[in-house]
Regions:
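Short alpha-helix boundary/capping motifs
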Residues: 51-55, 95, 144, 150, ...
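A structured, charge-rich N-terminal accessory region that forms the first stable segment of a protein
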Residues: 1-117, 123, 130
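Residue-level signal for alpha-helical context at structural boundaries
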Residues: 41-44, 85, 140, 162, ...
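Processing junctions and N-termini across compartments
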Residues: 116-119, 138, 149-152
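Short, cysteine/histidine-rich loop/knuckle motifs that typically chelate Zn2+
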Residues: 121-125, 143-146, 157, 178
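Domain-exit/linker segments immediately C-terminal to small folded modules
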Residues: 6, 149-178
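Short, glycine/acidic-rich beta->alpha junctions
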Residues: 59, 135-136, 146-147
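Short Cys/His-rich Zn2+-coordinating modules
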Residues: 97-110, 124-129, 135-142, 159-167
Length: 178
């Protein structure tokens, strides 16, 4: 799939939504698999080939502009759907991280606790709208402010942490929304 402009179907990016959740909903809306969306985002062009490493933490500026171009969402909102929203030391400090240089991740994780991979979830929120909230990625988040329930950290079926995918920022397949 190759495109230079907007994708035909563009769901709105919810203000509390994480970028990977939005991109997976975008894939479903356009009949694409998450790997196809990633290829659209990282394909080489005259402006360069954006990297998807650290996309949920501190994304490559090229990938932010590519997402904005394909979705019509402004770049600031795209960046705000990543952990950059929580930068400036409260609760994260991402200054040492360069998304184009993998080894710089060490500068960030040595500061103490850090949400490396995965997410918690509020089962009630997810059942309502299928949107994965960015705040659920923060280890200090324990309850859902909307429902007043504890966040769930692991799948009761398989025992794994949710949204743990070290080698791809998106899940390999998405289940269509009801």
């Amino acid at each position: 799939v190759a495109t230079r402009g907007l994708l035909p179907s563009r769901p709105a990016l919810d203000e509390r939504e994480s970028l990977d959740s939005f991109l997976e909903r975008l894939a479903i809306a356009n009949g694409l698999s998450p790997p196809q969306v990633l290829r659209l985002l990282t394909a080489a062009e005259h402006s360069g080939s954006p990297g998807a490493a650290f996309m949920m933490i501190k994304p490559d500026p090229l990938i932010i502009s590519r997402i904005a171009r394909l979705t019509g969402v402004d770049g600031a909102s795209v960046a705000d759907a990543t952990l950059l929203r929580f930068d400036d030391g409260l609760p994260l400090y991402l200054d040492g991280l360069d998304p184009l240089r993998r080894h710089t991740f060490r500068h960030v994780v040595t500061q103490g606790w850090f949400p490396q991979f995965g997410s918690q979830l509020c089962p009630l929120c997810l059942a309502e709208d299928g949107i994965w909230a960015l705040e659920w990625r923060l280890p200090l988040a324990a309850t859902c402010p909307r429902h007043g329930v504890f966040l769930t950290t692991h799948c009761i079926g398989c025992g794994h942490r949710f949204r743990t995918h070290r080698y791809s920022p998106l899940r390999l397949s998405s289940i269509p929304e009801k």
